[in-house]
């Protein structure tokens, strides 16, 4: 018990009376030796053959990869790090030379090349000396069609007709120039071609043969419709001839004039003209008050 109560060595407050081996070691460490200064690397001196190899690679590329640097380093017997530093210094020297050339004032007569003018927004980007021509041959400039002797553009107009092999009359000059239909619209008579007689489609002579080569057996039974619907009204796309021809023949729009019959029964008629002897008002075709006027032949 008494051993634990022995006081230790006395330490003064201002640490002037410190004693012991640990305290002595701490005081000895106060005087540290200075760190050794890094030795400067020796300056590399390149020979003429080494510079020729380095300049040849620098002419090819200013930023060689590690494989190219190692290959040159083996040729000139230098470490790859020296080759890398040489390229770094060579690029800096090249930039410095370019900067000095820009800062030097140029004489007045040295400016031979004029600065290209900026293109405006409305100017065409293509020029006569364009290196890349248009592969499709499409130019920006529009060439108008050639004018004929009458002053109208010579535009080829294809007249389309349905079931009409004969040559149609050419369109007027006003329609050929602007291609604008001067007659009534075609939609005003949508049922004009539906109820046209079959014999009227082959009434005009053509290369297909005689006029009665088609539907020759039905011509006597469809004969009342031929005078009302002329040849010019057969072509729905032939211009202004559609409107007047249909307006003059209101009976051509009535589909009830045919009645209901079969082609087999119609061939057995002895008197073809007697089957169509019914009278009615063209303006009121649906009002058949007097059925005695209907003179159909009973089979």
Swiss-Prot record:
Composition-biased stretches (Low complexity): 141-153, 236-247
InterPro entries, per database record: HD, Homeobox_CS, Homeodomain-like_sf, Otx_TF_C
Keyword Repeat: no
Main location (coarse class): nucleus
Keywords of the record: Activator, Developmental protein, Differentiation, DNA-binding, Homeobox, Neurogenesis, Nucleus, Sensory transduction, Transcription, Transcription regulation, Vision
A Pfam family matched in the record: Homeodomain
Repeat as UniProt keyword: no
Domain of life: Eukaryota
Tissue and organ expression note: Retina.
GO cellular component: nucleus
Protein function: Transcription factor that binds and transactivates the sequence 5'-TAATC[CA]-3' which is found upstream of several photoreceptor-specific genes, including the opsin genes. Acts synergistically with other transcription factors, such as NRL, RORB and RAX, to regulate photoreceptor cell-specific gene transcription. Essential for the maintenance of mammalian photoreceptors.
Family as reported in the entry's similarity comment: Belongs to the paired homeobox family.
Quaternary context: Interacts (via the homeobox) with NRL (via the leucine-zipper domain). Interacts with PDC, RAX2, RORB and SCA7.
Name of the protein described by the UniProt record: Cone-rod homeobox protein
Organism: Canis lupus familiaris (Dog)
Upper lineage: Eukaryota, Metazoa, Chordata, Craniata, Vertebrata
Gene: CRX
């Amino acid at each position: 018990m008494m051993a634990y109560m022995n006081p230790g060595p006395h330490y003064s407050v201002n640490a002037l009376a410190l004693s012991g081996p640990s305290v002595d070691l701490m005081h000895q460490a106060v005087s540290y030796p200075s760190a050794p200064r890094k030795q400067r690397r020796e300056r590399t001196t390149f020979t003429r053959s080494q510079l020729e190899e380095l300049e040849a690679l620098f002419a090819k590329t200013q930023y060689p990869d590690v494989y190219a640097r190692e290959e040159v380093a083996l040729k000139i017997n230098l470490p790859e790090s020296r080759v890398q530093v040489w390229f770094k210094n060579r690029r800096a020297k090249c930039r410095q030379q370019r900067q000095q050339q820009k800062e030097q004032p140029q004489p007045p007569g040295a400016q031979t090349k004029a600065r290209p003018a900026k293109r405006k927004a409305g100017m065409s980007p293509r020029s006569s000396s364009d290196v890349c021509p248009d592969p499709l041959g499409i130019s920006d400039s529009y060439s108008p069609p050639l004018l004929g002797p009458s002053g109208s553009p010579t535009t080829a107009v294809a007249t389309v007709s349905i079931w009409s092999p004969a040559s149609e009359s050419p369109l007027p000059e006003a329609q050929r120039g602007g291609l604008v239909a001067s007659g009534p619209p075609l939609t005003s008579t949508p049922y004009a071609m539906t109820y046209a007689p079959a014999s009227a489609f082959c009434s005009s002579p053509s290369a297909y043969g005689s006029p009665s080569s088609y539907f020759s057996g039905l011509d006597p039974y469809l004969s009342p419709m031929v005078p009302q619907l002329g040849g010019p009204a057969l072509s729905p796309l032939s211009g202004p001839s559609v409107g007047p021809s249909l307006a003059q023949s209101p009976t051509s729009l009535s589909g009830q004039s045919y009645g209901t019959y079969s082609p087999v029964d119609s061939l057995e008629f002895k008197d073809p003209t007697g089957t169509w002897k019914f009278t009615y008002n063209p303006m009121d075709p649906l009002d058949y008050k007097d059925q005695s006027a209907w003179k159909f032949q009973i089979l």
